[in-house]
Regions:
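Hot-dog-fold acyl-thioester-processing enzymes
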Residues: 2-60, 113-135
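Hydrophobic beta-strand-centered segment that forms part of the acyl-chain substrate-binding groove
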Residues: 43-89, 102-105, 110
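Core beta-strand residues in small-molecule sensory/regulatory alpha/beta domains
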Residues: 94-96
Length: 135
């Protein structure tokens, strides 16, 4: 499942499920899980200030759902690095409500040249930084 959010300092993001994200069944839209996961990865990435990192495109998004979220639920998200490849980095966002796993979303970023969008290698210094967050 992953680490408990309370045991991993500075890797937690939280939100309360708003009305705009609720479907006709009273559950959070599945697409909203992806949006929230991307927000959590963005917050995680903010830790890396002042770096000259490559441009990234989203290469893959995959979600697993365990229990539906409802209006007003308080959700904690833990972001970990799931994989570090030669040209890609994967992030897993673990979502919990009251300590119960509700979903995991993996977001894979591919490093690329910003003008040509051709794949490029992850810089070694960036790979080293990511390793400290490997799940």
């Amino acid at each position: 499942m992953g680490k408990e959010p309370s045991k991993v300092p500075n890797k937690v993001h939280e939100f309360r499920v708003p009305y705009r994200d609720i479907d006709v069944n009273g559950e959070m839209f599945r697409a909203a899980y992806v949006v929230r996961a991307e927000e959590a990865v963005t917050e995680f990435w903010r830790r890396r200030k002042g770096r000259d990192d490559p441009w990234f495109d989203v290469a893959k998004v995959n979600s697993t759902f365990h229990s539906p979220l409802k209006l007003g639920d308080l959700v904690h998200m833990h972001v970990g690095v799931s994989k570090i490849g030669g040209k890609t980095a994967g992030f897993t966002v673990h979502m919990t409500r009251d300590g119960e796993a509700v979903a995991e979303t993996e977001v894979v970023w591919a490093a690329c040249n910003p003008e040509t969008r051709e794949p490029i290698a992850l810089p070694e210094e960036l790979r080293d930084w990511l390793y400290q967050f490997l799940d």
